[in-house]
Swiss-Prot record:
Molecular function GO labels: carbohydrate binding; signaling receptor activity
Organism encoding this protein: Sus scrofa (Pig)
CDD domains in the record: CLECT
Gene of this entry: CD302
SUPFAM superfamilies: C-type lectin-like
Protein name (Swiss-Prot/TrEMBL): CD302 antigen
Known function: Potential multifunctional C-type lectin receptor that may play roles in endocytosis and phagocytosis as well as in cell adhesion and migration.
Protein backbone atom coordinates (compact mmCIF):
# COMPACT_ATOMS: atom_id res chain seq x y z
CA UNK A 1 0.00 0.00 0.00
CA UNK A 2 1.54 3.36 -1.09
CA UNK A 3 1.82 6.11 1.45
CA UNK A 4 -0.19 9.29 0.89
CA UNK A 5 1.46 12.64 0.15
CA UNK A 6 2.37 14.91 3.11
CA UNK A 7 -0.53 17.00 4.40
CA UNK A 8 -1.33 20.08 2.35
CA UNK A 9 -0.70 22.29 5.40
CA UNK A 10 3.04 21.71 5.05
CA UNK A 11 3.11 23.53 1.72
CA UNK A 12 2.01 26.90 3.17
CA UNK A 13 4.53 26.40 5.98
CA UNK A 14 7.30 25.90 3.46
CA UNK A 15 6.12 29.03 1.65
CA UNK A 16 6.17 31.06 4.87
CA UNK A 17 9.66 29.79 5.67
CA UNK A 18 10.87 30.87 2.24
CA UNK A 19 9.25 34.29 2.68
CA UNK A 20 10.91 34.86 6.05
CA UNK A 21 14.26 33.86 4.59
CA UNK A 22 13.76 36.36 1.77
CA UNK A 23 12.85 39.07 4.29
CA UNK A 24 16.02 38.34 6.23
CA UNK A 25 18.11 38.61 3.07
CA UNK A 26 16.46 41.92 2.19
CA UNK A 27 17.08 43.30 5.67
CA UNK A 28 20.73 42.28 5.53
CA UNK A 29 21.19 43.95 2.15
CA UNK A 30 20.28 47.48 3.24
CA UNK A 31 22.84 50.21 3.80
CA UNK A 32 25.64 51.57 1.62
CA UNK A 33 26.00 50.53 -2.04
CA UNK A 34 29.10 48.35 -1.47
CA UNK A 35 31.93 47.58 0.95
CA UNK A 36 34.04 50.39 -0.54
CA UNK A 37 31.67 52.87 1.09
CA UNK A 38 31.73 53.76 4.79
CA UNK A 39 28.53 54.51 6.69
CA UNK A 40 28.20 57.17 9.37
CA UNK A 41 24.79 58.00 10.81
CA UNK A 42 22.40 58.47 7.86
CA UNK A 43 25.00 58.82 5.09
CA UNK A 44 27.52 56.80 3.11
CA UNK A 45 30.99 58.07 2.18
CA UNK A 46 33.51 57.02 -0.43
CA UNK A 47 36.98 58.40 -1.10
CA UNK A 48 38.02 58.21 -4.75
CA UNK A 49 41.78 58.06 -4.44
CA UNK A 50 42.61 58.59 -8.09
CA UNK A 51 44.50 61.83 -8.78
CA UNK A 52 42.89 63.66 -11.69
CA UNK A 53 43.50 66.77 -13.75
CA UNK A 54 40.57 69.17 -13.67
CA UNK A 55 39.64 72.55 -15.07
CA UNK A 56 37.03 73.49 -12.46
CA UNK A 57 35.31 72.22 -9.37
CA UNK A 58 32.52 70.88 -11.58
CA UNK A 59 34.94 68.27 -12.91
CA UNK A 60 35.59 67.19 -9.34
CA UNK A 61 31.89 67.10 -8.61
CA UNK A 62 31.28 64.89 -11.63
CA UNK A 63 33.50 62.27 -10.01
CA UNK A 64 30.91 61.99 -7.26
CA UNK A 65 27.74 62.28 -9.33
CA UNK A 66 29.00 59.40 -11.48
CA UNK A 67 28.74 57.29 -8.32
CA UNK A 68 25.26 58.53 -7.40
CA UNK A 69 26.63 60.92 -4.78
CA UNK A 70 27.81 64.51 -4.37
CA UNK A 71 30.86 66.20 -2.93
CA UNK A 72 30.96 65.89 0.83
CA UNK A 73 29.06 68.24 3.11
CA UNK A 74 29.65 68.42 6.87
CA UNK A 75 26.98 69.38 9.38
CA UNK A 76 28.38 68.89 12.88
CA UNK A 77 31.56 68.31 14.86
CA UNK A 78 30.96 64.57 15.06
CA UNK A 79 30.79 64.23 11.28
CA UNK A 80 33.87 66.39 10.85
CA UNK A 81 35.78 64.18 13.31
CA UNK A 82 34.58 60.99 11.63
CA UNK A 83 35.78 62.18 8.23
CA UNK A 84 39.09 63.33 9.66
CA UNK A 85 39.78 60.01 11.42
CA UNK A 86 38.68 57.89 8.46
CA UNK A 87 40.88 59.88 6.09
CA UNK A 88 43.86 59.26 8.36
CA UNK A 89 43.29 55.60 9.25
CA UNK A 90 41.48 54.07 6.28
CA UNK A 91 41.55 56.27 3.22
CA UNK A 92 45.09 57.60 3.69
CA UNK A 93 44.04 60.87 2.08
CA UNK A 94 46.13 63.95 1.25
CA UNK A 95 46.65 66.94 3.53
CA UNK A 96 43.76 68.91 2.00
CA UNK A 97 40.40 67.62 0.77
CA UNK A 98 38.06 69.74 -1.34
CA UNK A 99 34.65 70.11 0.31
CA UNK A 100 31.41 70.33 -1.63
CA UNK A 101 30.97 74.02 -0.88
CA UNK A 102 30.85 77.18 -2.96
CA UNK A 103 30.33 80.90 -2.33
CA UNK A 104 27.02 82.12 -3.72
CA UNK A 105 27.42 85.75 -4.82
CA UNK A 106 23.65 86.18 -5.07
CA UNK A 107 23.25 86.33 -1.31
CA UNK A 108 26.92 86.44 -0.30
CA UNK A 109 26.91 83.16 1.61
CA UNK A 110 28.54 79.75 1.46
CA UNK A 111 26.34 76.86 0.36
CA UNK A 112 26.66 73.12 -0.09
CA UNK A 113 26.38 71.64 -3.54
CA UNK A 114 24.01 68.94 -2.24
CA UNK A 115 21.58 71.74 -1.23
CA UNK A 116 21.67 70.80 2.46
CA UNK A 117 21.52 73.56 5.06
CA UNK A 118 24.68 75.31 6.20
CA UNK A 119 24.44 74.51 9.93
CA UNK A 120 28.11 74.13 10.87
CA UNK A 121 31.53 75.48 9.95
CA UNK A 122 35.07 75.15 11.15
CA UNK A 123 36.92 78.00 9.47
CA UNK A 124 40.48 78.65 10.49
CA UNK A 125 40.91 81.84 8.44
CA UNK A 126 37.64 83.73 8.78
CA UNK A 127 38.19 87.36 7.79
CA UNK A 128 35.73 90.18 7.26
CA UNK A 129 35.69 92.05 3.98
CA UNK A 130 37.68 89.50 1.98
CA UNK A 131 36.88 88.84 -1.68
CA UNK A 132 35.11 85.47 -1.78
CA UNK A 133 34.21 85.24 -5.48
CA UNK A 134 35.16 81.79 -6.84
CA UNK A 135 36.02 80.66 -3.33
CA UNK A 136 35.68 77.05 -2.24
CA UNK A 137 36.51 75.23 0.99
CA UNK A 138 39.14 72.64 1.88
CA UNK A 139 39.35 70.35 4.89
CA UNK A 140 42.86 70.28 6.32
CA UNK A 141 43.32 66.66 7.43
CA UNK A 142 46.06 67.48 9.93
CA UNK A 143 43.95 69.81 12.08
CA UNK A 144 40.36 69.18 10.97
CA UNK A 145 39.90 72.89 10.25
CA UNK A 146 38.50 74.37 7.05
CA UNK A 147 40.27 76.88 4.91
CA UNK A 148 39.28 78.88 1.86
CA UNK A 149 40.80 78.42 -1.56
CA UNK A 150 40.22 79.11 -5.23
CA UNK A 151 37.64 76.91 -6.90
CA UNK A 152 39.64 76.88 -10.13
CA UNK A 153 41.86 73.99 -9.11
CA UNK A 154 44.02 72.25 -11.73
CA UNK A 155 44.26 68.86 -10.05
CA UNK A 156 43.07 66.92 -7.02
CA UNK A 157 44.71 63.99 -5.24
CA UNK A 158 41.41 62.41 -4.30
CA UNK A 159 37.71 63.17 -4.11
CA UNK A 160 35.52 62.64 -1.06
CA UNK A 161 31.88 61.90 -1.90
CA UNK A 162 28.78 61.54 0.23
CA UNK A 163 25.36 60.01 -0.41
CA UNK A 164 22.32 59.94 1.84
CA UNK A 165 20.81 56.57 2.67
CA UNK A 166 17.28 56.44 1.18
CA UNK A 167 14.48 56.64 3.73
CA UNK A 168 13.35 53.06 3.12
CA UNK A 169 16.86 51.70 3.59
CA UNK A 170 17.50 53.84 6.66
CA UNK A 171 14.25 52.69 8.26
CA UNK A 172 15.06 49.03 7.63
CA UNK A 173 18.62 49.46 8.85
CA UNK A 174 17.51 51.11 12.10
CA UNK A 175 15.12 48.22 12.74
CA UNK A 176 17.46 45.49 11.52
CA UNK A 177 17.81 43.92 14.99
CA UNK A 178 14.03 43.74 15.45
CA UNK A 179 13.56 42.30 11.96
CA UNK A 180 16.24 39.68 12.54
CA UNK A 181 14.65 38.66 15.85
CA UNK A 182 11.22 38.32 14.25
CA UNK A 183 12.63 36.29 11.37
CA UNK A 184 14.44 33.92 13.73
CA UNK A 185 11.37 33.52 15.95
CA UNK A 186 9.11 32.89 12.94
CA UNK A 187 11.52 30.32 11.53
CA UNK A 188 11.72 28.44 14.85
CA UNK A 189 7.93 28.43 15.26
CA UNK A 190 7.38 27.23 11.70
CA UNK A 191 10.01 24.52 12.08
CA UNK A 192 8.50 23.21 15.33
CA UNK A 193 4.96 23.38 13.96
CA UNK A 194 6.00 21.56 10.80
CA UNK A 195 7.75 18.84 12.83
CA UNK A 196 4.67 18.32 15.03
CA UNK A 197 2.36 18.09 12.02
CA UNK A 198 4.70 15.65 10.29
CA UNK A 199 4.92 13.50 13.46
CA UNK A 200 1.13 13.37 13.82
CA UNK A 201 0.76 12.59 10.13
CA UNK A 202 3.20 9.67 10.30
CA UNK A 203 1.63 8.35 13.52
CA UNK A 204 -1.84 8.38 11.97
CA UNK A 205 -0.47 6.73 8.85
CA UNK A 206 1.19 3.95 10.89
CA UNK A 207 -2.03 3.47 12.88
CA UNK A 208 -3.88 2.96 9.63
CA UNK A 209 -1.54 0.16 8.59
CA UNK A 210 -1.93 -1.51 12.02
CA UNK A 211 -5.71 -1.42 11.68
CA UNK A 212 -5.53 -3.01 8.22
CA UNK A 213 -3.41 -5.89 9.48
CA UNK A 214 -5.52 -6.39 12.62
CA UNK A 215 -8.75 -6.72 10.57
CA UNK A 216 -7.33 -9.28 8.11
CA UNK A 217 -9.09 -12.77 8.12
CA UNK A 218 -7.62 -15.12 10.77
CA UNK A 219 -7.37 -18.91 10.55
CA UNK A 220 -9.46 -20.75 13.19
CA UNK A 221 -6.44 -22.96 13.96
CA UNK A 222 -3.11 -21.88 15.30
CA UNK A 223 0.18 -23.69 14.70
CA UNK A 224 -0.20 -25.92 17.79
CA UNK A 225 -3.65 -27.09 16.72
CA UNK A 226 -2.42 -27.97 13.25
CA UNK A 227 0.46 -30.01 14.72
CA UNK A 228 -1.87 -32.00 17.05
CA UNK A 229 -4.31 -32.74 14.21
CA UNK A 230 -1.45 -33.96 12.03
CA UNK A 231 -0.19 -36.31 14.73
CA UNK A 232 -3.70 -37.76 15.30
CA UNK A 233 -4.12 -38.38 11.60
CA UNK A 234 -0.74 -40.13 11.43
CA UNK A 235 -1.64 -42.37 14.45
CA UNK A 236 -4.98 -43.32 12.89
CA UNK A 237 -3.30 -44.34 9.64
CA UNK A 238 -0.96 -46.76 11.48
CA UNK A 239 -3.93 -48.74 12.88
CA UNK A 240 -5.82 -48.91 9.60
Amino acid sequence: MARAAPPALLLPLLGLAAATAAAAAAAAAVGCPSSTWVQFQDSCYIFLQEAIKVESIEDVRNQCTDHGADMVSIHNEEENTFILETLKKQWKGPDDILLGMFFDTDDASFKWFDKSNMTFDKWSDQEDGEDLVDTCAFLHTKTGEWKKGNCEVSSVEGTLCKAAIPYEKKYLSDNHILISALVIASTVILTVLGAVIWFLYKRNLDSGFTTVFSTAPQSPFNDDCVLVVAEENEYAVQFD
